[in-house]
Each structure stands twice: as C-alpha cells, then as structure tokens.
C-alpha cells in the first residue's frame, strides 16, 4: 500500500480568503537593529487587511481617492454613521476588534531615556 498524499482543493483557499477578509487581520511590528546603545535601524509596521465592509465597520482609515459612497454601500451604513465612526478615538475603535486583535494593536515603540 502506498502512503496517502496530501491534497489541496481550490475551495479551501477561497474559504480562507473569505474568512480573512470577513474577520480582518491586524499586523503590528516594531523592529530595531542596535549595536551597543546606538540604534542603527528602526521600523514600525502597522497594517490591516480586511474587506471594505469589515474595515468600514471598525472605522479604519481608507487611502485618499477611495470612493467612500461605495464603501458605505458595501458596509450597509449611512453617511451619518460613517461620520460618527470617524469621530471615535482610536482606542475606542480597537476595543471593538474581536478576540485579542484589539489588545495587540497598541503603540509599543520604545521610549527614549532622558
């Protein structure tokens, strides 16, 4: 008997992408390269991947030039609701993220000593 071979179906990839866009993913990374006390390179990465609908529900900022009417239509919210999303603080928006995603998005940049 031969060993079973793993198979991949296109449905799995499509389901994974649908879940990713439906739930959204937030990436928060701080990278520092130092020698001794001298920091040579510092990178702060903040990225969010989500569908327009999910991003609009959480009040994430959209790039300039985005057709906001289409975003509001996709999210099923009125223009008044989208304005109220913009007025909430970032911490209020992050508190609404499901699971630990809201807790993991914070400003963790190292503080300079005086």
Swiss-Prot record:
GO terms for cellular component: gas vesicle; vesicle membrane. Residues 104-114 have a biased composition (Polar residues). It holds the Pfam family Gas_vesicle. The keyword Metal-binding does not apply. Its main location: other. Keywords: Gas vesicle. Residues 63-114 are annotated as: Disordered. One of its GO terms (molecular function) is structural molecule activity. Residues 80-91 have a biased composition (Basic and acidic residues). It comes from the Archaea. InterPro entries: Gas-vesicle_GvpA-like (IPR000638), GvpA (IPR050530), GvpA-like_CS (IPR018493). The keyword Cell inner membrane does not apply. Induction: Transcribed from early-log phase, decreases as cells enter stationary phase, probably as a long gvpF-gvpM RNA. Highly expressed in 25% salt, poorly expressed in 15% salt, no gas vesicles are formed at 15% salt. Encoded in a 14-gene locus called mc-vac. A minor component of the gas vesicle, proteins GvpF to GvpM might be involved in nucleating gas vesicle formation. Gas vesicles are hollow, gas filled proteinaceous nanostructures found in some microorganisms. They allow positioning of halobacteria at the optimal depth for growth in the poorly aerated, shallow brine pools of their habitat. PANTHER family: GAS VESICLE PROTEIN A1 (PTHR35344:SF4), GAS VESICLE STRUCTURAL PROTEIN 2-RELATED (PTHR35344). GvpF to GvpM interact with each other in vitro, and may form multi-subunit complex(es). Interacts with GvpA. Belongs to the gas vesicle GvpA family. This is Gas vesicle protein J. The gene is gvpJ.
